[in-house]
Swiss-Prot record:
High-level lineage: Eukaryota, Viridiplantae, Streptophyta, Embryophyta, Tracheophyta
Domain MADS-box: 1-61
GO cellular component: nucleus
Annotated protein name in UniProt: MADS-box transcription factor 31
Pfam families linked: K-box, SRF-TF
Primary role: Probable transcription factor.
Record-level Gene Ontology MF annotations: DNA-binding transcription factor activity, RNA polymerase II-specific; protein dimerization activity; RNA polymerase II cis-regulatory region sequence-specific DNA binding
Gene: MADS31
Principal place of residence: nucleus
Protein localization: Nucleus
GO biological process: positive regulation of transcription by RNA polymerase II; regulation of transcription by RNA polymerase II
Keywords, comma-separated and alphabetical: DNA-binding, Nucleus, Transcription, Transcription regulation
Residue span, K-box domain: 85-178
Length: 178
């Protein structure tokens, strides 16, 4: 019968933690050695203890420094470091391409550069322009409705004001007549 799983959490007792680290470190290095022998793999393991002490293992005949150098020179995109300048150039190129694409679209919206478009492209462009025109007209109508409401409100307020002071005006006119 196998052992139960150990709950993975930090061991609070420093002595127990150090003993567990030592045993598990030895087990890890043993597994690395077995993998190197069985699969003829170049393996390097670097482990730092909780106190900062470094332990390392490298599969014979390699040294850890050789394996680490090989790791740094690996042609994988995960490990390659791109030069900052190269990244900036790539981003600038991407942005220029995007800018050119958007300029072409804008010229097409303005009715220019249509010669390169297919019938389907022209139909799609027409639908997009019609939809844009619909949205513009809808917004225009909203603004006109808003202005109409504001003007109506002002007229009503002026009428109320006139009617509220009308009795006083009539009274003063009658006083002036006498």
């Amino acid at each position: 019968m196998g052992r139960g799983r150990v709950e993975l959490k930090k061991i609070e007792n420093p002595t127990n933690r150090q003993v567990t680290f030592s045993k598990r470190r030895m087990g890890l290095l043993k597994k690395a050695n077995e993998l190197a022998i069985l699969c003829d793999a170049q393996i390097g393991v670097i482990v730092f203890s909780g106190t900062g002490k470094m332990y390392e293992y490298s599969s014979p005949p390699w040294r850890i420094a050789n394996i680490f150098d090989r790791y740094l020179k690996a042609p994988s995109t995960r490990f390659e470091e791109m030069d900052v300048q190269q990244r900036i150039i790539q981003e600038m190129t991407r942005m220029k391409d995007e800018n050119n694409r958007l300029r072409i679209i804008m010229r097409q919206y303005m009715g220019d550069d249509l010669a390169s478009l297919t019938l389907q492209d022209v139909s799609n462009l027409e639908q997009q322009i019609e939809f844009s025109l619909y949205k513009v007209r809808l917004r225009k109508q909203q603004l006109l409705d808003q202005q109409l409401l504001e003007m109506h409100s002002r007229v009503c307020n002026k009428r109320i004001y006139r009617f509220s002071i009308l009795p006083y005006l009539i009274h003063y006119i009658e006083i002036i007549k006498f």
